[in-house]
Amino acid sequence: MATSSSSYGIEQLQKGCYYEWMSVQAKHIVDLKEALMSHRSKEDHKLEELVGKIVNDFQKYTEKRSELSRRSCSSYFAPSWNSPLENGLLWMGGCRPSSFIRVIYSLCGSQAETQLSQYLLKIDENVEVNHGGSMSDLNASQLAKINDLHIKVIEKEDKITKKSANLQENVADMPIAIAAYATDLMNGDVVVEDALDKYEEGMAVLMVEADKLRFETLRKIVDVVTPVQAAEFLLAGKRLHISLHEWGRVREEQRFGCVRTDAAAATGGAGTEKSKRSSLLM
């Protein structure tokens, strides 16, 4: 794994990879909007090409992440480029693959999620979304396949989560316990470093496994649905991802804005009181 001297450089590469992907997603949203608005029933091949390109772009992104995580994976579990809101929703360095299917359920027209569906699918305030073969038209066979996929994905998520828990328990096990009571501090530090290196290597493996599950889940969903449905699903998912990033950023700006205001008020008050005391001494 990376040494402390190179960790910062690797984190910057990871951050650059993330923002590059966010830029690509923004372009995907524009392309999907245009494709859905201009779609004709006999032009599914155009949507198929676009959907295929987007899936391939996601695969390239996960492969690049995997390469960078093998060099240092710690940053992916609490990224500095994310807001606390986003980091609180992370699972193994990203979103849960099962959340992809939750988006589908939302788009299918559940009454409890109608407003969310309308927001996610909003292409333009003045344009109605009304495509033949949309997510609201999923048939029984498609729903059955998606439900089966949902169950399998959750099982795989649980397995990865359990592996992660085992790694965490191992870190606090014998190597760390022995180091805590080591009389030779230098030898103790070496033991701890070895244990933490093994932990980070193990977490990098699990993150790669999680990224593969994310990609495979996306690919299988696209295989089940029609080109129009796939485009709507991808548009909704990307809008949600970018919106979460923006919501988190705005919340932090508001929060830190309040903190700065309070701090300025406190500092100003102290300064005023100090000036009063000074004037009394003169």
Swiss-Prot record:
**Chain ranges of the DOG1 domain:** 11-254
InterPro entries registered for this protein in UniProt: Seed_Dev/Stress_Resp_Reg (IPR051886), TGA_domain (IPR025422)
- Protein name as annotated: Protein DOG1-like 3
For this UniProt entry, the molecular function terms from Gene Ontology, in alphabetical order, are: sequence-specific DNA binding
Highest taxon of source: Eukaryota
Upper classification of the organism: Eukaryota, Viridiplantae, Streptophyta, Embryophyta, Tracheophyta
**Pfam families reported in the protein's UniProt record:** DOG1
Phenotype when inactivated?
No germination phenotype.
Instruction: From the UniProt record, give one GO term of the biological process aspect.
Output: DNA-templated transcription
Q: Which organism is it from?
A: Arabidopsis thaliana
